[in-house]
């Protein structure tokens, strides 16, 4: 049979494909502007472009590729489905594969407490479903979200998102969203900093909910990330997550935790909320849940399953290839204890980066959990604020990312103004690859400083 899919690399430059992309695709595209190359092949934590250049990938599909690129067991899972005759698309009809995937995913939650809801294929779809369910169950319309949070780009999910860049261009987003400050020990929203600042946010949240004159109607739900990713890799303190759980339970408010990016071993636990020992009412999952393919799922405490049949539907709920790769990924995560690997590799990277900050004080803060880390790039030549934080240096952070690309290291930035360099590699990364990251990142900092500050 003649191959009809143009997957073979042709003799052309990265710029050739970027120019064609510029002609054929909308101005909305983002990653090619900062990472200007065209994929030819990839394996594990390594990517090769059409010119033969090899890169160390610390982006991992924005967290989707928990096992890296083209893991052989996942590739075999895809082949097995293709050879089986199983339909690739089944709506919400069941199959033996879906049954096995569902059982495996539920095994990571407390026994007999949760059920699954398959939604559309993206995290935004799943967050929309979670909010709709909370409103259906409670009969209330308001939602509390947090500054710096990111929950997707659809109308409802965008209304829950803190970043104003995408929101300012769109009117009439979902009403009834009240934003609260998110604890940040380095850049405290109350200007206190450290543990005291985090405690102040806890007290503010509790008072806000319980104050009969706060001006906010009792919400249907509180939605948050246990680790804010796009917001600059900010980890919620354990006590804060516990306080939110305590207050929401006390007042009959659903607690929704968005684990789209932080979930599936990335934080050093299967789910980031597990660090606090809590049980959310709804857990939102996408990205890594599908083993690199599109899939999104809610885990819902059984007592909150208020849906009527067909109360929330979606065409792409039955992606059998994603369930195959998702099932295989879950087995590998458990069998190889990848949560522990993420914890150990994350500790190494954190310590190495903090040592690097002594030599290069533009690295103002290194934070995160496991292999979800943020490197806060600052202008240490300026005065610190009242909490001890230097001003953000967004220009230098952009230059570091650009230098990383030249040094064949792929990564992304986040946070206010994009001053936080993000570590989001595969959770099965090995020690030598982590050491190579430090080597390339250090050289990139040196190169960027020469460009921006010399």
UniProtKB/Swiss-Prot annotation:
The record's GO molecular-function terms, alphabetically, read: diaminobutyrate-2-oxoglutarate transaminase activity; pyridoxal phosphate binding; transaminase activity
Q: Enzyme group, top EC level?
A: transferase
Specify the domain of life of the species encoding this protein: Bacteria
Q: Name one GO biological process term.
A: biosynthetic process
Please tell me whether the keyword Transferase is annotated for this protein.
yes
Please tell me whether the keyword Cell membrane is annotated for this protein.
no
Q: Report the EC code(s) recorded for this entry.
A: 2.6.1.76
Q: What is the required cofactor set for this protein?
A: pyridoxal 5'-phosphate
What the entry lists under InterPro entries is as follows: Aminotrans_3 (IPR005814), Aminotrans_3_PPA_site (IPR049704), Dat (IPR004637), PyrdxlP-dep_Trfase (IPR015424), PyrdxlP-dep_Trfase_major (IPR015421), PyrdxlP-dep_Trfase_small (IPR015422)
- Pfam families given for it? Aminotran_3
Q: Which NCBIfam families does UniProt cross-reference here?
A: dat (TIGR00709), PRK06931.1 (NF005386)
Q: What family name appears in the similarity comment?
A: Belongs to the class-III pyridoxal-phosphate-dependent aminotransferase family.
- The name on file for this protein is Diaminobutyrate--2-oxoglutarate aminotransferase
Q: Which organism is it from?
A: Haemophilus influenzae (strain ATCC 51907 / DSM 11121 / KW20 / Rd)
Provide the taxonomic classification. Bacteria, Pseudomonadati, Pseudomonadota, Gammaproteobacteria, Pasteurellales
